[in-house]
Amino acid sequence: MSTSRAPETTSAAPLSAEQSASLYRLMTWLSPAFPVGAFSYSSGLEWAVEAGDVIDAPSLRDWLTAMLEHGAGFCDGVFLAHAYRAVAAADETALRHVAELATAFVPSAERHLETTAQGKAFIEIVRNAWPSDGLACAVDACAGALAYPVAVGLVSATHGVPLAATLHAFLHAVVSNWISAGARLVPLGQTDSQRVLAALEPAVIAAGDRAREASLDDLGSATFRADLASLRHETQYTRLFRS
């Protein structure tokens, strides 16, 4: 057996203290265990299952791909990126504008509850566990309810966590929660759920990259069926989820 070692590459270099802290915080803040209540929301997916739009792993993958590329996934990424940059530039006017636009952009009352309840919980937990000098000022500048992606962008900026990593981690967390809801509703097994998550990797990366470069004028949704699902869920007779 050979005892020679492969040459060390840059990928094997250790993380800096700052990189390690950023990674640790992202893994914590966007973990399913972080108590923002994400497990209780399906973003209208519960109605899509009842209506027969989502019936198995392939149809769930297609539904979520559309939401990532043309709906809530991409739009939330844009809001996150613009909130992050506004905080980094200490531009309170821009931050307030993004915060107001993000809450106005959701298509239904339940989706509004979903994003603002998670945003509020996220801010409160981070404020108590990871206090930051600039966090209170940034939150106060918004002067109203915070959408979840705005809250994440705001917190990451005040803690100096890189934007690109934040975007990808956020979208991964959102998609993972959608898949978790789908697994309970369809239902799907654990292996099928992971196959869907693996299949969505390119879409998550692409949505994050596109959102990072997008302007607010690029915002828009073409997922009419998903928006309708979030509206019809409000009157769905039997429900497991709050949206």
Curated annotation (Swiss-Prot):
Record Pfam families: UreF
Protein's name in the database: Urease accessory protein UreF
SUBUNIT field: UreD, UreF and UreG form a complex that acts as a GTP-hydrolysis-dependent molecular chaperone, activating the urease apoprotein by helping to assemble the nickel containing metallocenter of UreC. The UreE protein probably delivers the nickel.
Family listed: Belongs to the UreF family.
Gene3D superfamilies tied to this protein: Urease accessory protein UreF (1.10.4190.10)
Record keywords: Chaperone, Cytoplasm, Nickel insertion
Coiled-coil residue windows: none
Any one annotated GO CC term: cytoplasm
GO molecular function list: nickel cation binding
Described purpose of this protein according to its UniProt entry: Required for maturation of urease via the functional incorporation of the urease nickel metallocenter.
Cellular compartments annotated: Cytoplasm
Protein species of origin: Rhodopseudomonas palustris (strain BisB5)
Domain of life assignment: Bacteria
Keyword hit for Metal-binding: no
